[in-house]
Amino acid sequence: MPTMWPLWLLASLLALSQALPFEQKGFWDFTLDDGLPMLNDEEASGADTTSGIPDLDSLTPTFSAMCPFGCHCHLRVVQCSDLGLKAVPKEISPDTTLLDLQNNEISELRKDDFKGLQHLYALVLVNNKISKIHEKAFSPLRKLQKLYISKNHLVEIPPNLPSSLVELRIHDNRIRKVPKGVFSGLRNMNCIEMGGNPLENSGFQPGAFDGLKLNYLRISEAKLTGIPKDLPETLNELHLDHNKIQAIELEDLLRYSKLYRLGLGHNQIRMIENGSLSFLPTLRELHLDNNKLSRVPAGLPDLKLLQVVYLHTNNITKVGVNDFCPVGFGVKRAYYNGISLFNNPVPYWEVQPATFRCVTDRLAIQFGNYKK
C-alpha cells in the first residue's frame, strides 16, 4: 500500500518551491534521477523568485465540505494519488491551489474535468495513462503555474496550455514532434522538462520555441544526433545528456550565450570544433562525461567563469599544461572547484602540477584508475 504524504507537507513544499523552482525535493522529486544537481543559486538558475508567487494567506486552512471520496483535503491541497482513479474526480473545492492526481489510471482529460478550479496553482498528473486531452481541458485554469504530466502516453504536447504556466514537465511520454506555435502565448514559461521522449532533431519544427523566454530546458534521453539550433536564446540551463550527439560544430552554440550550465554527458561526442565554446562567456558548469573525446576540448582557458568540468569516462590520453588554465594570472575570474578526469587512459603521473594552477584545491581534481 503506497505511503500517503501528509497534507501539511504537501502545502509546505508548494510554498517552498517558489524560492527554487527548478530544484525538486521530496514530493516534487518525481523523475530527475540522472545525478546532475540543479543550480541552486538564484543567479545561476535565472529563476525569478518574486513573480507569480501566491500570497501565503492563500494557504490559510479552509473548511470546505467538498472533498472527493477517498482523497485527503486540507490547506487548499487536494491529494488523490494512488487511488486507482480512472477519471478526474468531481466535487473538488473551487479554492483548491494544489491538486495531486499522480499514480492513478486516468487515460483522458475531458472538457469539464477542471471546471471551476480557477485558483489552481499546481496540477500533478504524473504516472497515469493519459493519451487524450480535450482542447479546452485546461481553459478554466487561469492561474495554473506548474503542470506535471510526465510518465503518461501522450503523443503530442497538449494544445491551449494556460498562458499563466511557468513550469511544464512532460518527460517520459511518446512525443515525437514539437510543432510551430504549440507554445504560443506562454510568455511566463521559464522551465520545460521534455526528456525521455523519442524526439529526433527533425521533430522540432522551425519556430517551435518562438516567443518563449526559457531559463531551463531538458531534452535528455531522446534521439538527438546534434545540438538543436532553434532553442530559446534566453536559456541559462540546457541539458541534452543521454542522446546520440556525435559532434559539436562551430555554430551549434552560437545562440546560447547566456548559458550557465550545459549538460552533454552520455552522448557519443568525438569532436568539439575549435572555437565552439567561445560563444559561452558566462558558462560555469560543463558536463562532457561519458563520451568519446580523445583530448580536452579547446577553449576552456578562455571561459573566465567556468568552475566545473566533467570529462570522466572518455578516451583522453593526454592533458596539456594549458588545457584548463589561461596563461598568466588575473585572467580567470572564477577558479575551478571541480575537474573530473577519472576513467580516462591518462598517465596521471605525467600531468604537470602547473596544469591545475587555477584550481581552488587539489581535492577538486578527480583522477582515477583506467580499466580498458
UniProtKB/Swiss-Prot annotation:
Entry annotated with the keyword Protein biosynthesis: no
Bridged cysteine pairs (disulfide): C67-C73, C71-C80, C325-C358
Subcellular location: Secreted, Extracellular space, Extracellular matrix
Positions bearing carbohydrate: S45, S51, N274, N315
Alphabetical keyword list: Disulfide bond, Extracellular matrix, Glycoprotein, Leucine-rich repeat, Proteoglycan, Repeat, Secreted, Signal
Signal peptide (residue range): 1-19
Pro-peptide positions on chain: 20-40
Superkingdom of this protein's organism: Eukaryota
Post-translational modification: The two attached glycosaminoglycan chains can be either chondroitin sulfate or dermatan sulfate.
Record-linked Pfam families: LRR_8, LRRNT
SUPFAM superfamilies, A to Z: L domain-like
GO CC annotation: extracellular space
Renumbered ranges of LRR repeats: 86-106, 107-130, 131-154, 155-175, 176-199, 200-224, 225-245, 246-269, 270-293, 294-316, 317-346, 347-372
PROSITE patterns membership: LRR (PS51450)
InterPro entries to which the protein is assigned, alphabetical: Leu-rich_rpt (IPR001611), Leu-rich_rpt_typical-subtyp (IPR003591), LRR_dom_sf (IPR032675), LRRNT (IPR000372), SLRP (IPR050333), SLRP_I_decor/aspor/byglycan (IPR016352)
Role: May be involved in collagen fiber assembly.
PANTHER family named in the record: AGAP008170-PA, BIGLYCAN
Family the UniProt entry places it in: Belongs to the small leucine-rich proteoglycan (SLRP) family. SLRP class I subfamily.
Subunit details: Homodimer. Forms a ternary complex with MFAP2 and ELN.
Stated name of the protein: Biglycan
Biological source species: Equus caballus (Horse)
Record lineage: Eukaryota, Metazoa, Chordata, Craniata, Vertebrata
